Design a protein with these regions (language model features):
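Asp-based, Mg2+/Mn2+-dependent phosphohydrolase catalytic module
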Residues: 1-7, 113, 124, 128-240
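N-terminal helical cap/lid subdomain that shapes the substrate entry/recognition surface
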Residues: 2-11, 15-106
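A short alpha-helix capping/helix-coil boundary motif
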Residues: 50-54, 88-92, 110-112, 143-146, ...
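Short, conserved clusters of charged catalytic residues that mark active-site
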Residues: 106-107, 162
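Catalytic-core regions built around general acid/base machinery
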Residues: 107-118
């Protein structure tokens, strides 16, 4: 797999540990807004359900950034029966604190340093620009990447092929020289696959690296190369 020149990484939960950082940022908001920490686990569970559903709508252009930001905490507060807190203010505090978190996915720094010496590394991420760039800067990741492509700026969130095509064109990268690495099968892998780019699926939570029947069906319909890894350090023998 050493014929590649450009490696495109997803950010959240591929190299920047979104799950833990999101949790830490939201927990930090609780005392500021007078929320009991005993409510946190249930609040976080409900919030994630609403947030995931709203982000799916956003990816399909079914909701605006402003409505997503406003609704995810208002819906959570309402379901929890909590009054007297403005969901927009809570959202702003959360967005201010989250990009300051610095937890990385295990092995991220270990693989990025040697990969950056051999390849041009780039980011393709869904998210809000004011947050994603700060994540990269505060975590020390920014130094490894030549280009960063944020869906909000391009107005085409993954898995839309437009964001992948835009990245290739901007980087002057050919499809056969490019590889997408990400944790989401639907967003990163199928998105890159449909854009004609090879992919590596980072799936640390799966019991093994085998593909499901539905995934194999997708692979058979496409001519790109797909691999699955369970540790970021598995990239080293594949790419170095």
């Amino acid at each position: 797999m050493t014929h590649y020149r450009h490696l495109f990484f997803d950010l959240d939960n591929t190299i920047w540990d979104f799950n833990r950082n999101s949790r830490d940022a939201l927990m930090g908001c609780f005392p500021v807004f007078g929320l009991e920490l005993s409510l946190f686990e249930e609040f976080f569970r409900i919030y994630n359900l609403h947030n995931d559903a709203l982000w799916e709508l956003y990816r399909r252009n079914g909701i605006s950034k402003e409505d997503l930001s406003k609704a995810r905490f208002n819906l959570t507060l309402e379901e929890m029966g909590i009054s007297g807190i403005d969901g927009r203010e809570l959202n702003q505090a959360y967005l201010s604190g989250m990009p300051l978190q610095t937890r990385l996915c295990e092995g991220a720094m270990e693989v990025l340093a040697p990969l950056a010496r051999k390849y041009q590394l780039h980011i393709i991420t869904n998210g809000f620009s004011e947050v994603q760039y700060k994540k990269l800067g505060h975590s020390g990741l920014a130094t490894f990447f030549s280009k960063v492509f944020v869906s909000e700026e391009i107005k085409a969130p993954k898995p839309a092929p437009e964001i992948f095509r835009h990245a290739l064109k901007t980087c002057n990268a050919r499809k056969r020289e490019s590889l997408m690495i990400g944790d989401s099968w639907e967003v990163d892998i199928l998105g890159a696959m449909n854009a004609g780019i090879d992919q590596i699926h980072y799936a640390p939570d799966l019991p093994d690296a085998s593909f499901t029947p539905a995934e194999r069906e997708s692979l058979h319909k496409n001519r790109t190369l797909t691999r699955r890894i369970q540790k970021l350090t598995d990239l080293i023998p594949l790419l170095l």
